[in-house]
């Protein structure tokens, strides 16, 4: 109980205290006109009410991570609560807020443009390709689970394949139409459904507080096969959007083009991430409470079935048929609304690169059709493999974004430590994961075996972490020396 409420207090208090601190560093200017007015085009640059901007941003970023990722993440024990709270306030919310404001200050530029502006043209091109691949992956990954959930609620004649096609038809409309026509009108409904689900699950959770794991129980791993699921780095990749996600930085420019005033940035970008962290916290606790605090039962269920049926079962058992339906609607809406804006972002990134105007439907179709085809083809790959690669790509993108913001703050002679520390940490997470994860380079089967043969007193985890810390330090040093010194030199020349 206490671990849950302490984490909740950190999230809420962090928004008001640390969020305000970050806001001061960013030099917010309320008198400066935003891109919604200076770049208005009736399609992507449109001033929207703040409540709509918040709900759209929240739905854009709240994909599978804060629900499915949080449920898988709680298998690592109370450490998941700790990471969701601290990771959100000092990592994810700062990442989303700073990247959103950099985009806003650069006329609503897409993420590759923002990164390239700080780290150079070479990395801009890398980021364009990287972000485009991630957006297409999101479009594919965030279709399968919603389609399965809807298929389970409808007649057998409307199978999963039917709903996959239906969702893709919706994606096409959401990608092509002006943002205020479909997304601006539909998202608030989905947003309220998602918030209703979170509040409903939270209220029921209050009657099962004794089953929520405590920090005093120990922060050790609860996975039965913990050696193949080490807390570091696996937990930080699994929880993903529930604490920090590079995908969010690709979505923030969409709302940077619709926000009416710079002062609203903290409410929209930082606030939406904090709400997502609260959502992740609720679902992590709910999964444990549903199985009466038994990690073994939760692990067994996830092994036999998956997270989607569990979400359905918790919702209908706790909230009844009507409440369960609204809850499932929110769960379905979260990934679908992330998928559609991901493909919209892919269109905008491609159009920015080609300098291809998007003022007519035909011109938008020219860019969109190849993107949709690629996303549909990728869906034919096994979902578990897709999800793991998505998870790593997602967090790797946050590394690029955090380093870009760090360089920006250094150039402005601001307190860049607020993004430097998260950048260093996430660099180590992503490096460690890709170096010895089964879907990565699996260096633990190569280098570490050789080292242990020479030094038998060392174990495989010590070797792996030492290698990865070394690589992370090397990567960080390269960023610091090449980019940090370069931009400071440029700043001196301008002075």
What label would you give each PLM region?
Residues 48-65, 202-210, 219-283, 329-338:
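Hydrophobic, membrane-embedded alpha-helices of multi-pass small-molecule transporters
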């Amino acid at each position: 109980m206490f671990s849950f409420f302490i984490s909740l207090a950190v999230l809420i208090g962090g928004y008001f205290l640390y969020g305000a601190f970050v806001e001061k560093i960013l030099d917010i200017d309320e008198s400066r006109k935003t891109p919604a007015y200076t770049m208005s085009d009736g399609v992507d640059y449109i001033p929207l009410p703040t409540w709509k901007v918040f709900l759209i941003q929240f739905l854009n970023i709240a994909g599978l991570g804060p629900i499915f990722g949080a449920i898988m993440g709680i298998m690592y024990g109370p450490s998941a609560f700790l990471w969701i709270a601290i990771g959100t306030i000092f990592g994810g919310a700062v990442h989303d807020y700073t990247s959103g404001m950099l985009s806003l200050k650069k006329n609503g530029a897409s993420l590759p443009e923002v990164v390239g502006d700080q780290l150079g043209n070479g990395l801009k091109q890398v980021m364009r390709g990287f972000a485009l691949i991630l957006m297409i992956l999101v479009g594919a990954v965030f279709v399968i689970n919603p389609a399965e959930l809807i298929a389970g609620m409808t007649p057998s004649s409307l199978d999963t394949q039917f709903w996959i096609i239906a969702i893709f038809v919706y994606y096409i409309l959401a990608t092509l139409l002006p943002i205020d026509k479909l997304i601006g009108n539909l998202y608030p409904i989905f947003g309220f459904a998602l918030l209703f689900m979170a509040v409903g699950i939270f209220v029921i959770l209050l009657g099962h507080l004794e089953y929520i794991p405590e920090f005093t129980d120990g922060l050790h791993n609860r996975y039965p096969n913990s050696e193949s699921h080490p807390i570091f780095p696996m937990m930080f990749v699994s929880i993903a959007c529930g604490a920090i996600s590079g995908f969010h930085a690709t979505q923030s420019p969409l709302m940077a083009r619709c926000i009416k005033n710079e002062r609203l940035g903290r409410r929209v970008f930082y606030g939406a991430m904090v709400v997502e962290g609260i959502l992740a916290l609720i679902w992590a606790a709910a999964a444990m409470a549903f199985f009466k605090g038994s990690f073994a039962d939760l692990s067994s269920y996830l092994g036999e079935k998956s997270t989607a049926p569990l979400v359905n079962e918790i919702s209908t058992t706790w909230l009844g048929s009507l409440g369960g339906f609204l809850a499932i609607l929110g769960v379905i809406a979260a990934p679908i609304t992330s998928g559609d804006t991901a493909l919209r972002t892919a269109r905008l990134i491609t159009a920015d690169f080609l300098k291809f105007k998007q003022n007519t439907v035909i011109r938008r179709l020219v860019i969109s059709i190849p993107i949709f085809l690629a996303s549909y083809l990728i869906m034919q790959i096994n979902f578990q493999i897709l999800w793991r690669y998505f998870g790593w790509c997602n967090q790797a993108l946050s590394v690029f974004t955090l380093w870009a913001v760090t360089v920006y703050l250094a150039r402005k002679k601001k307190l860049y430590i607020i993004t430097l520390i998260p950048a260093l940490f996430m660099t180590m997470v992503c490096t460690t994961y890709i170096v010895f994860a089964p879907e990565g380079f699996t260096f633990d089967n190569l280098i570490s075996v050789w080292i242990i043969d020479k030094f038998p007193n060392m174990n495989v985890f010590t070797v792996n972490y030492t290698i990865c810390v070394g690589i992370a330090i090397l990567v960080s040093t390269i960023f610091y020396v090449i980019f940090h010194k370069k931009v400071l030199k440029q700043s001196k020349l301008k002075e």
